[in-house]
Amino acid sequence: RALFAYLALAPHAVGRSRLCELLWDVPNDPRGELRWCLSKLRGVLDEPDRRRIETPGDTIALDLKGVSVDAIDIASAAAKGIETLDLQRLQALSGLFVGDFLDGLEIDRSPHFNSWLIAQRRRFSSWHAAILEHLVSKLPTDADEMSTHLE
């Protein structure tokens, strides 16, 4: 989950060394661990006619075109401006939030990943609050749905 999330949210391909430093202890075999995790991800993500994991040179990227990933949908909407979204889109986005970002995932021996994870959780929490704020402002004041979102 950690590897997928990091690659999915990365704006560009990520170096293998960076991923190894981020996710694994150096004394172990981080490149071996990375290869193993990539093989597991390929089994889940790749389609018969499309490889979703791209490994140009010494970097790794995900090809998620045509795939709906909640975190990417939220980040994309935030980049365009939450205040510009209509009521239906705000409702759809608010439904994507279920707990914290990568809830339950902690990697004790990876302080760099944990720092990234905390930053992402703060970012998504902020977006969630903004989405709910704009959603409630667009609902009629007597809407039953308003109390659900205000909670």
Region annotations inferred by a language model:
Residues 5, 9, 24-31, 50-151:
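Intrinsically disordered, charged and Pro/Gly-enriched terminal/linker segments
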Residues 1-5, 27-46:
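DNA-recognition element of transcription regulators
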